[in-house]
Amino acid sequence: MKDKTINTKSFNFKRFSIYGGQSGMPVSTDGVLLGSWINLAPESLVLDIGTGTGLLALMAAQRFEDALISAIDIDQHAIDAATVNIEQSPWQDRISLHHDSVLTTDFSQRFDAIICNPPYFNSGEQAQQSQRATARHTDSLDHLQLAQRCFEITTDAATASFILPTPEGEGFIKLAEQCGWYLAKRLDVKTTDKKPASRILFELSKDPVCGQDLQRESLTIHHQGGYSEAFIALTKDFYLKM
């Protein structure tokens, strides 16, 4: 039987490179946006859920020099690629990898922050390429279970940051609020000025005060045939040509 596994495209950033291997998770604008946007408290203990090739963990390590990051993924191909990327980075001493499910892992301590680019296909046929399907289909990580688990394994002062397409993001926020989370920050992302927002980046908090003082902003990626000044300012520490 022919092996249908597809090698995943690699990508170079200013201070690290991402080897895709057979992870099924090529570098995406979504991941770069989230990694550039998150905010972490000093000396945070961070969990990157569904790390894929390790992109978010590496971005967090670059931006926050005293953060300790655990990165978890259920897929062995993802862990294999992430291992290469982390070992070749300047921050391998601050990132640990775990091949397991976040839903069943017994963590030894609670986290100060969650970062996650979660799956979002709620219906329809899964992609033929199996790793890609697993990475993007909510059958492998239900949003309600994810929100609840994030609440359980974090400290009282913790934050949890995600990026999702707008409809799925709206739904996730409602589910998270049922679990005790409050929406603290939100960034609505448009590809161009003429299109509606296609992505939501959002930060959840356990503090009710944050829910009463929502910080909401918007960002347009492309402007007049190039990248917008706001997008460049957000991502310039990572993209080579910014």
Curated annotation (Swiss-Prot):
One of its GO terms (cellular component) is cytoplasm. InterPro entries: DNA_methylase_N6_adenine_CS (IPR002052), SAM-dependent_MTases_sf (IPR029063), Small_mtfrase_dom (IPR007848), tRNA_Adenine-N(6)_MTase (IPR050210), tRNA_adenine-N6_MeTrfase (IPR022882). It is an enzyme of class 2 (transferase). GO terms for molecular function: nucleic acid binding; tRNA (adenine-N6)-methyltransferase activity. It is found in: Cytoplasm. GO terms for biological process: methylation; tRNA processing. Pfam families: MTS. Its EC number is 2.1.1.223. Disulfide bonds: none annotated. It comes from the Bacteria. HAMAP family: tRNA_methyltr_YfiC. Belongs to the methyltransferase superfamily. tRNA (adenine-N(6)-)-methyltransferase family. This is tRNA1(Val) (adenine(37)-N6)-methyltransferase.
